[in-house]
Amino acid sequence: MPEFSLGDINSKTASCIFPELYKLLEKRKEEAQVDHSYTASLMAKGLDAVLKKIGEESTEVVIAAKNLDHQEQVHEIADLCYHLLILMVYHNISLDDIHAELQRRLNVSGIEEKKSRAKN
């Protein structure tokens, strides 16, 4: 099996959609048109509503994975990503913040990374 390279990822599909979607969610937050936007209405309901939705979507991902249904998993993971982006916008956490954290972890074993969190 050939070694995986990050360069093999189609940059348009893998990296451009998240910034585009993030900007759209920021716009929905700013415009706050709760009658016309699901995202704006969810954010207007507050943090608990956003977190509840993330919990629901997380559970749906688990169920889809358990059912071994590829298309259902894709659908539910996309829903979860969308709602995580809503949370990020809600708390002003940028994609750059997440990128920096993942980059920091890239060459660190999971065991070492968890140990470093315990010290903080």
Language model: regions and residue ranges:
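Flexible "arm" and connector segments at domain edges
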Residues: 1-77, 81-120
